[in-house]
Structures are given as C-alpha cells and as structure tokens.
C-alpha cells in the first residue's frame, strides 16, 4: 500500500495497454471545479517513470491537448497502425473523440483522429472490446448505446430501440470470455446484458428496488458472473450476480458507508476486486468469498474511479475529487516510515495542529492472506538442509492442489563416498591402512611427509619410528659394526664356540639407543668380575710404595687405602690425570662420576662438537641442543631428542625446535621447511601448531588445483582439500590420544582455526545428508562456540532430537526461589477470595478489595494467543457484566489443542454488547444520584488510570493491529498507522449522564466534525504520584492520547441507536463520529462513578495486579461488585465548578508527571543501531540467547492465525535486546534477575519466571518499557507451546 506517484488533477483516466513503461491518460472531469476555479479542459499524458528513483511523487504531464468539453470516461486500446495505441474519450458535450497516442507524445498538431457526435447527450461510459480492439461501445444519456468500429467510424450502430428512454446508461463492460456479450447499468436501476451479435437484449437482472447502478464488471474467468454497485447513500452495496439466477444476487458485499462509484475486477486474479465511492475510501475485496481484505489510504473527497493496471496488476490508480490521482501498489514496503509519520501526527497538540501537522495522506496497511495469482508458481523447488531437495508440483493443470516431493541430493557424490569410506575405516580401527592409502595417494611431498610421520607415530616405539623415518637407522648399524670390530661387543665363547644368539644379553647392543656412554658393555661393573680368591698367587709382585712415588701418588694411594675415593679423585683431577680420575670415579660412585664428568667438560674448550653434545646428554640439558645447535642439523637434533629426552620434556623440546624452524621460514621465506616444522609439532603432539601449517598448505594446494583443474569444480576441489585436512587431524588425535582441554572455555581458544574447519566440514557433510557425521565433528567444538551452537541445534532439529543449550557460566546473581516475592501493599490483591466473604475495607493505598479475585488466571484451556474482547469496568461500583472470557463449564482437558479458543471465549457477552435502551433515555445511575450537568463548551474531565497513562506500557497491553487508532481530524488527513486501540468501540471516558432537568430528549442523527475553534478532547495523563493532586483537565486542553492502547476520546453523544455494521477501518477525519457510546472499556472509569465523585481524581493510581491472567493477550476477568467508594460524597454538588489546581512539586522517588504541561525530553540516541547484538555484555548474553531460542520455538509452532501476536511479542523482545546491546535502561541487578528469569524459562519453571517478572515490574518500573510486555507474553506462550 505504497503511493508511488501522484497526478495533481481532478480527472478521469485510462492506463496505457502496452507492456512498456506505463503511461496514464487523463481527461478533465466533467463538472469538477479546480482549486483555482479554472474552466480549462484538456487531455494529458503522464509518464509514471517508475524506474526512476529520483523522480518526485508528483508528476508533470509529458503531453497535453486542449478539448472543448470535459470528460466522463476514457479508454485506451492497442492498434496495429499506432505503436502507442488509440485513446477514446467520452465528452460531456456528447462527442466521441479519438486521439493518436504517438502523435500526442511527439506534439504533432494532427493528433486528433476523429470526433463524432452520434449521441444526443453526454457520453457517460465507453470501453474497447478486449478481444476485438477495433470495437468501441459507448453509452450515455437517454439510454443511448452505440457500437463503433474504428475502421468505419461514420457508421456506428445502436443497440436497443431508437425511442428515447428516461434513464441514462451510467456504466458498461465487455464480457472477458465471450466477445459479443456486453452489460450496461443505468440510472434507473436496469442491469441489461446485450448480445452484440444479434443487437438485442439477452437478459435484465432483477435489481431489487430498481436502485441506480453506478458500476458493473464481469468476472475475468467466469462468463456468467458479474458485479454491480449502487451509488445510494442509504444502502451502498455491491452485488455479485450469476446469470443462471437473475432474480437475486448470489452475494452482497457491504463495507462502504456511502455510495459506491467505481469497480475494477483484476484480470489476472479473479479473487481481487477494487471498489471506491463517496465515503472517500478504496476497498479491496475477495468477491468469491465476500471477504474484505482491507482498505487503502482514505482521502479527503469522493473516489470516483479506480482501475487495475491491465499489464502489471501490482499497480492500480484511484481518482478522487480532492484533485489527485494516486498510483499505488498492493505491496507495502514502508510500514516503519508510515508508523513514524503517524505517531508524529498523532502526538501534535490541538493548538498547533494545523501549523505542524504533516501533509502526508493517511497510511493504511493490510496483508493479503494469499499471494495473488500472478505471483503464484505452478511448480517450485528449494534446497533443504541435510542434502534434500523439496519440490512442489500441481497435481493437475489449472488446479491449486499441489504435491510435495522430498528427494536426496548431493553436490558431489565423491564427497559422500569418501566420507563414508573414512568413517567406516575409523570404526574398524585400521589406522595403518588409512595412512598407507593416503601416503600412496598424496599429491605433494608435504602431504606425503605428514602421513609418513603419522604412520611412524603408529608404531610400537614412536620415537624409534621417528628415528628410522629420519634415516638414522643405517648409521646406528654402522656404528654397531665398528664397535664389534673393536671387540667391545664381542660375545663370550663357550668351549671355543660362539654363544647361542638367544643367550645374548639384551644389553649387548644397548649402544644403539645411546642411553649412557658407560652402559655399552654388558658388564655394569667390570671390577666385580675379578675373583677374590684367598689362594690367588701371581708371578707379578708389586710394592704399594717403592720410594719413587711423587707426593700426588702418595696422597692418592693413602686415600684409596682409606677408602676415601672422593679425596683420591680430587688429587687426580688436580694433577689432570683424567684417565685415573674416571677409573677412581667409577669405584667411588655416582657423585664422583658426576664430578669427574664436570671437570672433564670444563677442560674441553677446543674439543670436537660431539663433546658438547655429550655434555648436554650427560647434564640432561637438551635445551642447549635445541636452542643453540645449527638448524641445518635439525634432523640430528630431533634424533637426539628421540634418544635422550625425558618423557615429560619431550613434547616441549619438539615444540621449541618447531618454533625455531617456523621462525626461519618467516625470515627466509623457504616454505620447504614447513614439513620439517610440521614433523616437530607432530612428534610433540602440538595440534594447535601443526593445524596452522596444514591449513596454510590446504589453501595453497587448493588454489593450485583450481588453476590446473580441467573438469572439477572449485567446490569439489575445496571439499577434497578440507576432507584431507580433517582426516589428518582425526587420525593424529587418535594416534596421540589428544585431549582438548579448552572445550569448556568461552573464548580465546588455541584451536579456533580448527574449530572453524570443523564447523565448515560439518556443514558440507550435512549438505550431503551425513547428519550423524556432522554431529560427531560439531561435538569436538567447545559448547559455547556461537557458530557451533547454531549448527548443532540445526542438525538436532533435522534429526528430530531435542535441542539443548549449554548452561552459561555460573553467575553471582541471587537464585530466586519458587515462592512468590513479597509485594508492597499497593500491589496486593485481597487475601479473602471466598464468594461469600464480606468485601474488605479499602485502604488509602489500595483500591477497594473485590469479593472475588479479579486477577485469578482462567482455566488452562484459555487461549494465550487469543485477542482480547472488551469487558466492563471492574472498578465501577455497578455490578460487572458476565465474564465473556471465562471458559465454559465443559472446558476442554489439558490434552486438547492449547491454541484452540475456550468455549464461548469469542461469543459476545453482556459486557461486550452495546446498551439497548430507548432513544434519548438517560443511562442508569448509581444509587439514584444524578450526574452533574454537562458543560456545553468543554469536555468533562477523565479519570486517569494506570492503563490510560501516557507513555506507560501497561501490564495488560495487547498486540498492535487489533483495531484502528484515532485519526486526527483536519482539512488534509494526517498519516494514520495501522496500529490501533486494543479495545475497539470502547466508551468515551466522559460522563454519559442524561441532559439537565427540564431538557427533553433530542434526536441528533449524527455529530458533525468539531469546528476549528472547539477544544479537542482531554489528554490521557499519567496517574498522579502519592500525595500529588492531578492537574486540572479543564484548565489546559490537551491533545488526543499518544498511547496506542489508550481509550479513544470522543465527545459525548446524545442518542444510543446502534450504528450500521461495517468492516474494521480507521476513522476518517471527514466522517461524523458515532452517535452512541460503544461498549465500555473495562479499565476505563465508569461514567457514573466519574460523575459522582469529584474527589476520585485525587486518589492514588490503580496499580497493576501482581499476577496477570493466563492469557498473555487478554485482560483479566471482570471482578465482582466492589465495595462502596468511601471517598465519594453522598450527594455530589451538581453545579460545583472544577477547582483550578497546579500540580505540586514532586517528592523524591515519585514518578515524573506526564501531564500536558510537561514536555517530555527527547531520549539520547542509542550507541548502536537497532538489531545489533554484537555488543551485548557477557553477563547479559544468556538473556538474549535463551529468550531468542525460546521465541523461535514458539514462533515455529504457533498457529498461523496468531502470527500477529507472536510477531508483536518478538518485536518487543528486540527492544530488550537493543537495551542490553546499548547497556542502557536496565541496571546490573535487573540484568542478573533477567538472567535467572531466562534460565527459569529454559528449565520450563514458569512459576519462577513469572515471580521474577512481577518483581521487576512492580519494584523497578523505571526500567520497564515495551520489552516487559514481550517477556510476559513469551512466558505465557512458551508455557502452552509443546
């Protein structure tokens, strides 16, 4: 419902028939008067320029030609001789004019093709035959009906008798299916069907009462059906006829409040009919069902013509007597802008209304329940999640029934096969064969090297496998052979023969692993092999001291004799006798050995490199080798680590070596070293390091494959590279038994790049239908990874598993128990609920206690999505009407549909029906006290309640869109958004008392719009704070309420006659208001109570109840009769003037007054745009995550009939998320409570959630906004959603 362009003319019009950019021809409307009182008449052409975004809404004509008379109708048809076609005009003078559109556009002087005057009076209607474009039917005054052939304009023929008729032919239409059938409608009420072939009447419809016919239109698909319209004010109806029964219409469409002037039936969709009329409205109907889809923006004067575009029915045009032709579309694309304009206009004060109100016309919005036929597709298909294609095909051509087919689909079958092969090999545990296959099929040396290293790690001795992979196995064999030649490993012989092979000790070749330089011999202590035999005698006697010894020799000898090996070692080292020192150290033990080794290495400054290596091995300081050895010998370093490193240091040493290699890559750019660094990381089980290298290699290999590939798609190449990466990581994790210690972290993961690859791979395999495989890899990603969480839930939904969410980190917020929170006295309902209990005495802080609990939730069968129905005021002293919301006695059980309305919940009850009383009779009063006389120039004051306070979202707010908002009344209508009061037809919040004594009943058929000088109705104000008197409503006249849910203020009416039924719509500023009070608003003060007690305005505001009813969209049930008001005087002064009061200064902590005298400060602009969720702090993120997920669950399962209510709740929740993102409005303790509320909803502990909600709403109202209502509704909707 967007106005695309406007033509500033009061004119009849016709669309161009071509498929090119649409043009409109306009002819000055006969009898219309322009604003400048010009009598100029002309034919003009207008280019809509819909493709030009810079074009203004108001157009300028592209061609113009003057005429001698005004137009009653225009028609435009194709022509073989004229590319743009021919325009025909029926003039008021009776002339028929024909123009060449091409020549009009070019400005040629001979644009007029013909001008004939066969008609004796004005031509009222004309139309070209849709199948034979050369045939033109014209009808006019005195019943004249001519058929003209453009090929022979001089000889038209007349249908019917030549005798003059008293009625005029007002409209006509060719049958869309049968070319020679024509229908006409006359001012006398005759609807005649003509057979042009026989030139006779075929049928006359029995138009009951012979009411004038203003418009006729044939059904575009059924040749026997047509619609007619009547222009009468008293009975503006549209009749749908079937020629097979001409005695009575098949259906009657009612909705216009004044005569209907024009009809247009869409050629592309027979379910769309436009009508316009004297009530300034254009309505869209479904003529097949009689349902009104809605109305388009109301203008300021009669809409006398409306037409669909014949080529593109997305557009239509409507002409009105306000001097404009509006070109509109049926698709609304700017609802937010329209709402903003409407809200701005609605909030204007009465004094400055005409100075500040915008000139935009009314905004109206509605949605078609189904797509128009030209947007429907006979077949469609879409890719579904999980490797599925969903296709829809019609069961039969021309029908609407469709068949849905779901078929599996794989983008690349090789991906699915390779995934299945790899997963099956994993299940069998045959990792060796996987590695061998990948080594064989590897495309690059780096890939092959990685798999060989992984294969080496699979061996029984991973370090030995790595040594062999590095090529050091042969060198160990060579050393072994060299040592054998020296006799160091020669085995003892038994009886001159070599000992059996199996008898060789395991330490014989222990040097291969070089565990210790002193452990190469099988004899751990060769001195122990010397026999200590008593009778051992030798032929080689010696002297301990022979007199030639040096002093050092003597000292060493004495130390040895005393067994002081350490002192002997010191003397040997002092004399630099290294050989003797080592021998003494061997006898002296480990401490002496280490001392000898240290002294030895300190002396070897110019020794070979192997001595430093030996020093590192002996000193268990392999870090010296890792950090200081030249990287050209990285393999030797790696072998040394595999041979000598302790188990606890091995991984870190390999990691350090890999880091040195990576640093060299960055310094030199030599990417060939990457595989060396990769080996180091693999040996050290450093997955986070090796994954980065693998991902870089994957990217390069993928790019190279894409450049050289001839047939494979880039997707297939990418998926294969991703598959290879995932396989390497998976095998490596199993080989090293890798445990991810960061799965419980919230952020800053070392393996974040791997997690991204897991998520991508899961999406790929899920697309190929392997959902279980996708779930397996997503389970390797931390639970709090945002993308993985979405992907996991998506897969679980596809597998029909319950979606779960990881609990956020434990907050320090207090845990709210299930018991209700203590409530202050002002919000406590009475504790006595017995039906027979005496009404409690009211206090100064609470309203009178009802005998029955007015806030008790209805039975479980109540509908949480049901729209509310207005009920009587529970605070009125009169007895409340029957509760229309209470479930019937036979309420459905819990197992029934939770969305089904309860029995009788939609049946009109006494509280909903208008009061039926005699015309002019006074309404019943309370206690026989007559109301005070009504002032003649000022509206009575209204009692402000919590629900009518300005800018305060009330606890019982309802979803938007249930009814229309009041429209500001002025010369040019203000924009009016499609949001309206939730209490349609409610009573005006003014006294409806009888006239003063002595004044008899007066009959007033309607109340005209108030003149400019009359003050508007009083503004709804906020409830005054405790101890604060409300502002005098008569001292300052406020504008209408800005609260979209407030009651509609109206002037008091006199009569009580029921208005005629009409379709829902926004009130027009040019229509008179209703003449009777609509059904009352249950939350508005009763007229009698208000009139009877002037002091009532000084009472404290009525607080919201501590607990809402079970229905999130319905107000609580009405209460029982209340106790008498202790503040009301027994006999109010009937003529007491209102007191002139000024609101006193507010006390600390009181709610700021929102009276009309106080200007509301404009809020500061938000830090971040609406919809942004990236700045929600971590402590508040559970609110967003849990409530969003639950809202989506409710949204996906709620019935479509409640879409508006669900969407409204979601919109209100987005307000909360915006506040959280901007970190405004909500204080930290409220955020903590909301986290607890969200977790209660997640755990389906709705009582706790409701208790927290009431606590926040009651004690922290300054932090509550529109979002609070959305939370309340989500709690109720979630509770009943399975």
Curated annotation (Swiss-Prot):
Low complexity bias locations: 973-992, 1084-1100, 1152-1162
GO term, biological process aspect, one: protein transport
Alphabetical keyword list: Cytoplasmic vesicle, Endoplasmic reticulum, ER-Golgi transport, Membrane, Protein transport, Repeat, Transport, WD repeat
Alphabetized InterPro entries for the sequence: SEC31-like, SRA1/Sec31, WD40/YVTN_repeat-like_dom_sf, WD40_repeat_dom_sf, WD40_rpt
Cystine crosslinks: none
Bias type Basic and acidic residues, positions: 491-505
Region (Disordered): 491-511, 801-845, 906-1176
GO molecular function ontology, one term from the record: structural molecule activity
GO cellular component, as recorded: COPII vesicle coat; endoplasmic reticulum exit site; endoplasmic reticulum membrane
Bias type Polar residues, positions: 801-815
One Pfam family recorded for the sequence: SRA1
Entry superkingdom: Eukaryota
UniProt repeat feature WD, residue ranges: 7-47, 66-109, 118-158, 164-204, 208-251, 255-295, 298-338, 382-407
Location in or out of the cell: Cytoplasmic vesicle, COPII-coated vesicle membrane; Endoplasmic reticulum membrane
Primary location class: membrane
Cross-referenced SMART domains: WD40
Membrane topology: Peripheral membrane protein
Biased composition (Pro residues): 921-934, 1006-1021, 1030-1043, 1071-1080, 1101-1120, 1129-1146
The family this protein is said to belong to: Belongs to the WD repeat SEC31 family.
Stated role: Component of the coat protein complex II (COPII) which promotes the formation of transport vesicles from the endoplasmic reticulum (ER). The coat has two main functions, the physical deformation of the endoplasmic reticulum membrane into vesicles and the selection of cargo molecules.
Record text on subunit structure and interactions: The COPII coat is composed of at least 5 proteins: the sec23/24 complex, the sec13/31 complex, and the protein sar1. sec13 and sec31 make a 2:2 tetramer that forms the edge element of the COPII outer coat. The tetramer self-assembles in multiple copies to form the complete polyhedral cage. Interacts (via WD 8) with sec13.
Name of this chain's protein: Protein transport protein sec31
Species assigned in the record: Emericella nidulans (strain FGSC A4 / ATCC 38163 / CBS 112.46 / NRRL 194 / M139) (Aspergillus nidulans)
Higher taxonomy: Eukaryota, Fungi, Dikarya, Ascomycota, Pezizomycotina
């Amino acid at each position: 419902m967007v106005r695309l362009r406007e033509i500033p003319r009061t004119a009849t019009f016709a669309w161009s028939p071509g498929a090119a950019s649409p043009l409109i021809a306009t002819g000055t409307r006969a009898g219309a008067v322009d604003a400048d009182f010009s009598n100029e008449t002309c034919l003009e052409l207008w280019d809509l320029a819909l493709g030009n975004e810079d074009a203004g809404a108001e157009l300028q004509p592209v061609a113009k030609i003057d005429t001698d008379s005004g137009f009653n109708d225009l028609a435009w048809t194709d022509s073989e001789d004229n590319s743009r076609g021919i325009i025909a005009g029926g003039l008021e003078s009776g002339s028929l004019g024909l123009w060449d559109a091409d020549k009009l556009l070019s400005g040629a002087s001979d644009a007029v093709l013909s001008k004939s005057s066969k008609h004796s009076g004005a031509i009222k209607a004309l139309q070209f035959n849709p199948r034979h474009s050369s045939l033109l039917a014209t009808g006019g005054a005195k019943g004249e009906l001519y058929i003209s052939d453009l090929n022979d304009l001089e000889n038209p023929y007349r249908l019917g008798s030549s005798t003059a008729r008293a009625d005029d032919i007002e409209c006509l239409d060719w049958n869309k299916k049968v070319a020679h059938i024509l229908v006409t409608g006359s001012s006398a009420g005759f609807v005649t069907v003509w057979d042009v072939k026989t030139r006779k009447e075929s049928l006359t419809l029995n138009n009951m009462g012979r009411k004038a016919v203003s418009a006729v239109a044939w059904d575009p698909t059924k040749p026997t059906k047509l619609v007619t319209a009547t222009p009468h004010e008293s009975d503006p109806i549209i009749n749908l006829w079937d020629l097979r029964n001409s005695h009575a219409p098949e259906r009657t469409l009612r909705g216009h409040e004044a005569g209907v002037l024009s009809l247009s039936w869409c050629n592309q969709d027979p379910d769309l009919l436009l009508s316009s009329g004297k009530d300034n409205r254009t309505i869209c109907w479904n003529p097949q069902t009689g349902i009104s889809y809605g109305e388009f923006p109301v203008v300021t004067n009669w809409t006398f013509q409306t037409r669909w575009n014949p080529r593109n029915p997305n557009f239509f045009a409507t002409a009105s007597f306000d001097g404009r032709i509006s070109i509109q579309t049926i698709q609304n694309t700017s609802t937010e802008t329209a709402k903003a304009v409407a809200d701005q206009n609605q909030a204007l004060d009465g004094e400055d209304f005409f100075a500040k109100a915008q000139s935009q016309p009314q905004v109206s919005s509605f949605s078609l329940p189904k797509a128009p036929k030209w947007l429907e597709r006979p077949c469609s298909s879409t890719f579904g999640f999980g490797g599925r294609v969903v296709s829809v095909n019609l069961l039969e051509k021309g029908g609407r029934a469709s068949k849905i087919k779901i078929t599996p689909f794989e983008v690349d079958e090789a991906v699915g096969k390779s995934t299945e092969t790899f997963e099956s090999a994993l299940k069998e545990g045959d990792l060796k064969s996987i590695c061998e296959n990948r080594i064989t099929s590897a495309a690059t040396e780096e890939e092959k090297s990685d798999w060989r290293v992984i294969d080496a790690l699979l061996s029984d001795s991973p370090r030995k496998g790595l040594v062999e992979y590095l090529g050091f196995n042969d060198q160990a064999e060579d050393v072994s052979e060299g040592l054998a030649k020296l006799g160091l490993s020669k085995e003892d012989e038994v009886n001159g023969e070599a000992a059996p092979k199996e008898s060789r000790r395991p330490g014989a070749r222990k040097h291969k692993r070089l565990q210790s330089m002193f452990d190469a011999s099988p004899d751990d202590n060769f001195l122990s092999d010397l026999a200590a035999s008593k009778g051992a005698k030798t032929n080689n006697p010696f002297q301990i001291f022979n007199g030639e010894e040096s002093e050092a020799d003597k000292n060493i000898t004495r130390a040895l004799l005393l067994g002081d090996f350490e002192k002997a070692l010191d003397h040997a080292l002092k004399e630099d006798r290294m050989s003797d020192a080592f021998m003494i150290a061997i006898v002296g033990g480990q401490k002496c050995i280490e001392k000898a080794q240290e002294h030895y290495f300190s002396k070897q400054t110019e020794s070979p490199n192997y001595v430093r290596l030996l020093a590192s091995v002996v000193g268990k300081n392999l870090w010296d080798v890792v950090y200081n050895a030249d990287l050209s010998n990285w393999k030797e370093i790696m072998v040394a680590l595999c041979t000598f490193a302790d188990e606890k240091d091995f991984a870190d040493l390999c990691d350090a070596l890999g880091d040195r290699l990576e640093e060299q890559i960055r310094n030199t750019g030599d990417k060939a070293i990457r595989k060396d660094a990769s080996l180091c990381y693999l040996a050290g089980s450093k997955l986070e390091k090796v994954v980065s290298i693998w991902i870089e290699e994957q990217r390069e290999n993928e790019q190279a494959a894409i450049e050289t590939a001839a047939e494979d798609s880039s997707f297939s190449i990418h998926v294969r590279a991703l598959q290879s990466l995932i396989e390497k990581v998976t095998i490596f994790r199993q080989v090293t038994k890798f445990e991810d210690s960061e799965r419980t972290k919230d952020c800053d993961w070392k393996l974040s790049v791997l997690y991204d690859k897991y998520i991508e791979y899961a999406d790929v395999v899920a697309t190929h239908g392997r959902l279980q495989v996708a779930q397996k890899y997503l389970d390797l990603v931390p639970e709090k990874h945002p993308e993985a969480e979405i992907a996991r839930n998506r897969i679980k939904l596809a597998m029909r598993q319950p979606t779960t969410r990881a609990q956020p980190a434990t907050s320090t917020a207090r845990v709210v128990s299930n018991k209700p929170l203590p409530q202050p006295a002002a919000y406590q309902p009475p504790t006595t609920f017995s039906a027979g209990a005496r009404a409690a005495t009211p206090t100064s802080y609470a309203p009178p206690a009802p005998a029955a609990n007015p806030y008790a939730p209805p039975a479980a069968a109540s509908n949480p999505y049901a729209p509310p129905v207005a009920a009587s005021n529970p605070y009125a002293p009169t007895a409340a009407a029957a509760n229309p919301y209470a479930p019937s006695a036979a309420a459905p059980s819990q197992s029934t549909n939770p969305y089904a309305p309860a029995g009788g919940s939609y049946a009109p009850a006494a509280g909903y029906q208008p009061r039926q009383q005699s015309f002019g009779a006074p309404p019943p009063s309370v206690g026989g006290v007559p109301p005070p006389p009504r002032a003649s120039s000022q509206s009575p004051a209204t009692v402000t309640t919590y629900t009518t306070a300005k800018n305060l979202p009330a606890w019982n707010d309802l979803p938007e869109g249930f009814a229309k908002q009041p429209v500001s009344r002025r010369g040019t209508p203000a924009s009016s958004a499609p949001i309206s009061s939730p209490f349609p037809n409610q009573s005006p919040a003014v006294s409806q008392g009888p006239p003063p004594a002595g004044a008899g009943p007066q009959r007033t058929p309607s109340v005209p719009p108030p003149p400019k000088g009359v003050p508007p109705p009083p503004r709804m104000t906020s409830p005054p704070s405790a101890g604060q008197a409300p502002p005098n409503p008569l001292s300052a006249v406020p504008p209408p309420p800005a609260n979209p849910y407030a009651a509609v203020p109206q002037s008091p009416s006199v009569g009580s006659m029921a208005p005629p039924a009409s379709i829902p719509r926004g009130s027009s500023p040019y229509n008179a208001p209703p003449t009777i009070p609509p059904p009352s608003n249950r939350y508005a003060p009763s007229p009698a109570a208000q009139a009877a007690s002037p002091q009532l305005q000084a009472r404290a505001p009525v607080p919201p109840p501590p607990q809402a009813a079970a229905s999130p969209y319905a107000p609580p049930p009405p209460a029982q009769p209340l106790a008498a008001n202790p503040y009301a005087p027994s006999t109010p002064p009937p003529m007491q003037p209102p007191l002139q009061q000024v609101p006193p200064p507010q006390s600390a902590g009181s709610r700021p007054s929102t009276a009309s005298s106080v200007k509301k400060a404009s809020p500061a602009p938000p830090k971040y745009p609406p919809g942004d969720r990236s700045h929600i702090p971590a402590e508040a993120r559970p609110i967003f995550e849990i409530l969003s997920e639950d809202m989506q669950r409710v949204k996906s399962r709620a019935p479509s009939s409640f879409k508006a209510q669900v969407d409204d709740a979601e919109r209100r929740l987005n307000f909360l998320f915006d506040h959280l993102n901007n970190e405004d409005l909500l204080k930290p303790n409220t955020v903590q409570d909301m986290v607890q509320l969200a977790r209660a909803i997640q755990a389906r502990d709705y009582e706790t959630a409701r208790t927290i909600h009431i606590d926040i709403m009651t004690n922290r109202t300054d932090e509550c906004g529109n979002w609070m209502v959305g939370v309340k509704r989500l709690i109720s909707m979630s509770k009943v959603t399975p």
